[in-house]
């Protein structure tokens, strides 16, 4: 922690509050939406609309970072989500709630891209993966703590979590605005400063593989974990909702425990072997879901998935940080869109397959798609300069 620049420490602390606040409202979103007397599909739109806007605004957010700098974009983005959450808390009908949550998606995209840009620009390559691990770990801790607080607030009112989320976001924004003062985070006055275009980034093989890996991770891991996996446990394995919540917490704790180690190994051994390790572990975890006929096997699969996710959640972003140059907000936004896009596509396809066939068919198809990651992991070039140079000399 002491090795990190102050601006990176600031982003990590601020993002912890963002993640905790989001965790506070996660349990209440579907129930609060349902309280307006709408269908389950309509409830789904409240959740999906936020993700869709995040997806389509990724490049726009990146352009804003290039023009105005990370500090201002982060603060305005957090402020937008805070205001939209406050408005959602006082929504009088479903359509108002949908509109306010949709508007919040743009703000979420803005502060996410700004956060990544701060990390990529502020740390050296030999510290990048560890920094990303700490950043992801902060999000995990916040996401674990949030739902417990949200559950207590829901006993007071379904609107209460949104009020609290709004306040927590203001705290996050104030921290960022007060401490993000590094000169390299301000908008440049040099019109000739090197700006990496998306076309330039796509010409790099490692960037293309990082992009594809992030998309597949969103599709096959993050998406189903938020959609069909809980339903599989309750409807197929006859587990309880409490069991789902408990196991998800255990999986997140395991992921958090391995995050720092994964980052250290990535900075020492290189991105390529860590991507391979993560891809293989995650593949086996997903295969375990297909054969899980008891809750004990589900628990084991989620623990293994937590380990694999620790390696996979940091490596692609570290690879992107290795290859970008100059003011690269649009490239970072484009990369963020990959994961968001996968999280939109994954639940739709896996949910459809579960409806027309069964959960195991959905898991099998998802595993088949994810297998592409194994091929990519063995084709990716090393992006950590020191490791790549040592291999060439050897």
What are these regions (language model features)?
Residues 58-69, 259-270, 354:
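Helix-to-loop junctions at the C-terminal end of transmembrane segments
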Residues 72-86, 273-288:
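Structural signature of the two symmetry-related core transmembrane helices
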Residues 100-139, 319, 323:
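Cytoplasmic helix-loop-helix junction between adjacent transmembrane helices
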Residues 1-5, 181-211, 393-394:
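Juxtamembrane intracellular "pre-TM" segments in multi-pass secondary transporters
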Residues 28-40, 227-242:
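Short amphipathic helix-loop junctions that connect adjacent transmembrane helices
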Residues 84, 95-103, 285, 296-304:
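Paired small-residue
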Residues 37, 69, 90-95, 238, ...:
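Helix-breaking motifs and short loop linkers at transmembrane-helix boundaries and internal kinks
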Residues 51-59, 143-144, 252-260, 343-344:
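Residue-level signature of mid-helix packing/kink "hotspots" within the transmembrane helices
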């Amino acid at each position: 922690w002491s090795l990190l620049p102050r601006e990176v420490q600031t982003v990590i602390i601020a993002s912890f509050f963002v993640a905790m606040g989001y965790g506070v409202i996660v349990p209440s979103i579907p129930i609060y939406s349902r309280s307006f007397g709408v269908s389950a599909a309509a409830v789904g739109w409240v959740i999906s609309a936020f993700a869709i806007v995040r997806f389509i605004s990724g490049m726009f957010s990146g352009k804003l970072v290039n023009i105005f700098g990370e500090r201002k974009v982060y603060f305005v983005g957090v402020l937008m989500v805070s205001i939209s959450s406050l408005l959602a808390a006082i929504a009088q009908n479903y359509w108002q709630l949908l509109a306010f949550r949709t508007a919040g998606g743009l703000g979420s995209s803005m502060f996410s891209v700004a956060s990544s840009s701060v990390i990529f620009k502020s740390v050296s390559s030999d510290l990048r993966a560890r920094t990303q691990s700490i950043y992801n770990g902060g999000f995990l801790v916040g996401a674990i703590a949030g739902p417990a607080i949200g559950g207590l607030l829901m006993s007071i009112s379904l609107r209460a979590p949104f009020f609290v989320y709004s306040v927590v976001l203001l705290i996050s924004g104030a921290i960022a605005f007060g401490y993000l003062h590094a000169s390299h985070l301000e908008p440049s006055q040099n019109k000739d400063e090197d700006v990496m275009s998306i076309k330039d980034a796509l010409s790099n093989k490692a960037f293309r593989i990082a992009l594809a890996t992030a998309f597949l991770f969103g599709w096959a891991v993050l998406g189903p974990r938020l959609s069909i996996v809980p339903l599989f446990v309750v409807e197929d394995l006859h587990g309880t909702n409490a069991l789902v919540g408990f196991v998800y917490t255990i999986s997140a704790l395991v992921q958090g425990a391995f995050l720092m180690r994964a980052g250290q190994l990535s900075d020492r051994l290189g991105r390529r072997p860590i991507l391979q390790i993560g891809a293989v572990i995650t593949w086996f975890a997903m295969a375990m879901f297909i054969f899980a006929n008891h809750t004990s096997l589900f628990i084991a699969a989620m623990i293994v998935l937590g380990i694999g996710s620790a390696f996979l959640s940091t490596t692609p972003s570290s690879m992107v940080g290795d290859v970008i140059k100059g003011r690269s907000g649009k490239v970072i936004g484009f990369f963020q869109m990959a994961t968001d896009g996968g999280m939109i596509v994954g639940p739709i396809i896996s949910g459809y397959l579960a409806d027309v066939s069964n959960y195991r068919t959905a898991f099998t198809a998802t595993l088949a798609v994810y297998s592409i990651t194994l091929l990519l992991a063995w084709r990716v070039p090393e992006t950590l300069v020191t490791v790549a140079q040592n291999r060439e000399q050897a």
